[in-house]
Amino acid sequence: MKNIHFKTCTCLLGILLILFSGIQVKGASLEVQQESKVSGTVTDEKGEPVIGASVVVVESKQGTITDIDGKFLVNVPKNGHLKVSYIGYETQEVAVKNRQLLKVILKEESTALNEVVVVGYGTMKRKEMTSAISHIGAKDLNQISSLDASMLLQGKVSSVSVSNTALADPNNQGSIQIRGVSSRNAGLGPLIVVNGVPGGDMTNINPADIESIDVLKDGAASAIYGTRGSNGVILINLKKGTKDGQVHTTYSTSVTFNKAKKELDIMNAEEYRAYRTVSNPLSDMGADSDWFDAVTQLGVTHMHTLTFSGGNARTNYRVTADYRNARGIDLRSDRREYGARANINHTTKDGLFTFSANITPRVIDRNKSANVYSNAIKNNPTMPIYDSESANGYYRFPSGTEGSNIVEQLNEEENGTEIKLLEWNATAAVNLLPLFNPKNPDMVLKSQVTISQYQVDKFNGWFTPSTYGSNVNDGVTGKASRDFDKSTTNNLEWVTNFSTRIKNHQIRAMVGYSYNYGVNSGMSAENWNFSSDGLTYNNLGSGLEAAKDGKTMMGSYKNDHKLISFFGRVNYDWKERYLFTFSLRHEGSSRFGENHKWGNFPAVSVGWRISDEKFMKGLSWIDDLKVRYDYGVTGNQEIGNYNSLATYRAFGWYQYNGNRFHVWGPSKNTNSELRWEKGHNQNVGLDFSLFSHKVTGSFNYFHRKQSDLLGDYSVPVPPNLFSTIYTNVGTLRNTGFELDVTVNAVRTKDFTYSFTLVGATNNNKFVSFSNDVYKGQKYYSTCSMANPNNPGYLQRIEEGERIGNYFTYRYAGVDKKGDWLIYDKKGNVIPVAQGTEEDKSVTGNGLPKFTGSMTHNFTYKNFDLSVALRGAAGFDIFNVHDFYFGLQSMTTNQLTTAYSKNAHITTGKNVITDYFIEPGDYLKIDNVTLGYTMNLNKKYVEKIRLFGTANNLYTFTKFTGVDPSTYEVNGLTPGTFGGGYNYYPSAFQFILGLQVSF
């Protein structure tokens, strides 16, 4: 179905053509035939006028286009015929039959080939595309309870990995990775473009405002964004106002319940006494505490959205206001936010100018928790939570005790953040056709300028009172801190588009200029030892700690960056059969060395619609078949603003000749040769539509090579001041296959069934770690595991190997004392104490080789049902909770596996071996949505929809730890928790919603 944004744009073009071109299709005059004037109106199936529709007299080839009200007037011979056409609609031929007034209703084309897809700085019909671009309409997006739009895409697009390791935490945000890891240390996330403005924030978008999302996955599509396109581009198209002259009001509300899943079998007090206190009777503190339950609650979220939309063909508007109150499943986490969005679009009466403006303010008040469940897991269950004799009523853990009273922390500690966001943009466009007065109705010449600003102000406050357990132990009468961070980004985009069709040739061209300037600033201050707890963090100056000699308990910063670009693109097609696209972006960034600030990012793509060839006409079951190839160069500049410059920092106070001096010096090795990280991308694709458009989809093979990777590299000292330098070293390669298929299996009057299958493979390899300047390093270790016992590194990134390799000892059993035995490099069994780094090897990989999903959609009369499955295969997970809490030698509380599955390991500590590596494959019943829609069409109520959604219902897996989808698979340490063991429990989620349209 056509999206509203496309209709708006094409209608606007129609208006401009009407008012300025004076177009008339010329043909041979039919003097011998008697003609009469025939007028009429062209509308769509909803009754809205179709502006700019072509109305051609079949016999004379003369014609016109419909005006702003969809009306037309033509001279037609007796018994003549009219051919009425418009982009995205089925062409109709109408017999006049001596009628003077006609009404023509155009139907949208049933095929997805004419679906409009947003590309960089423009739109295209799907059948014209020569790149790997995925389009998702609003109705196909996930039903979510948050304003984090990234979760809308989970499982919807092949090779788009959306990971959220704490879905029930209202303050956690998902991470997005497209076609695998693309860098060592530079940014890994895609560029977000909202309504054509680069640099958007997916957390500042109400899902109710989203019309569609387009994902640019390959280099040719994303190269138009140059240095910011290396990790792919996500284009979010927001809804605009209606044009039927009516005011439409929509109210939607939902309530979400999150119930934590207790996936770890933690010992209770009785089990703890039976197993642990035999060897250490003093560890029994006499209580019976369930720390997990004590910090867990039922998470409840309320969302309300009110939308007003209206206007006519010249002016339309849309205003949205929303409120969200979310409570997480732990005692502390909550989030309250208020937001709005206002959009207005106007075309002048003469059709020469078009103006549009958007403003999106949002205020967020949140409380975050840290390390809640790591403490809940490891705390001694015989340790009491409360103590009536303490100053604040909570039991104070003795100094040196493992863990902490996390219930006290959640209730007594203040740790809040207030965030104020303001995003606005304004666009002015001019139709340049009147300057040339063309006679070609297919010609467009339009120039537009967009200015925008995105500002984020963040205020953090933290306070622990004098009665707080750790403060009492440390003899501190309260601690407090305040932080303020401000980020402002300004954009200017000037784009001119031209298109024309000459017989069977269509040419489109675009040129543009972009200017981006960002400033980040902030300050922080802290103090201790207050005379009163009453003012919390609101009177830092009253603390006594900062007054001590030499104390520096405050700081500030400011930095900026600039990005300037010139870009262009040319599209050509012949009969929509042979397709060609070329683009180039010339871009300069202030973040790189003096001689390397500018870079060129070209792209070329070709397509061949084989189905239009004569030799394919006999294959009636093939509706459309297109092959395409593209190559594009992208860049990555997501690094620190001053990484290429010499920077200095304070090193404290030092004595010299009896005097104290504040000493400054270089903060890092300077690299004036720092330059772009480049991605060389190739893609071969096949788009198909079969069996009267019942089966549609695409198949892609991609090859992406990232060179001059940005990151830290080890260097000798001296001659260098520091042991690492931030530079361009290394090459990384990703290859894979993608399949996206939709099958419209059943379509009757009352019942429909369709399903969508999405799947992708990924083969990742780190090709090299050296270049002509920096040589010798073949690998670097990553994922340093947290204490106790200083376990070391879990993974290694190495030349010729995949990212995510576990580099560990190989488990060979235990000795008579219950300590680890391992295999050495020769295959001999030795005690773990004799093991060296040379005895370690690659024992698994945490990066999935295959990811996929399947969504089933059913409708029966007014009911609709959606069932989505999602999974991953071909990867391993390091069971961190078994590693830290599943061994008898650990001093914290343990999982029951320490005395069941791992009972034979009695003295062995947490040594990194492949014993803890398990297959991570899983298949998840991800979500089920059942809805009922009442189309009332009453005077005051147009439509009511009720729905219920259940998320995260069940996971099929052989993994013995927590939900495998809570392990991070994006980034450089897939299959782990990044070296720690803190996690946020998986939760069953149920959403109940109501939508009313007036």
Please state what every model-predicted region is.
Residues 1-362, 394-398, 407, 423-424, ...:
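Short, small/polar-rich motifs associated with maturation and membrane association
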Residues 865-925:
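C-terminal beta-barrel architecture of Gram-negative outer-membrane proteins
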Residues 845-877:
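Glycine-rich, aromatic-lined ligand/substrate-binding cores of catalytic
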Residues 512, 569-573, 758, 805-816, ...:
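Exposed, low-structure sequence patches enriched in small/polar residues
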Residues 141, 189, 273, 299-302, ...:
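Extracellular/periplasmic, surface-exposed regions of secreted and cell-surface proteins
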Residues 150-156, 724-733, 775-806, 842-855, ...:
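C-terminal extracellular loops and terminal segments
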Residues 55, 84, 192, 500, ...:
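Short aromatic-centered micro-motifs
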Residues 262-293, 382-410, 535-561, 652-669, ...:
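Flexible glycine-rich, low-complexity coil/linker segments exposed to the extracellular/periplasmic environment
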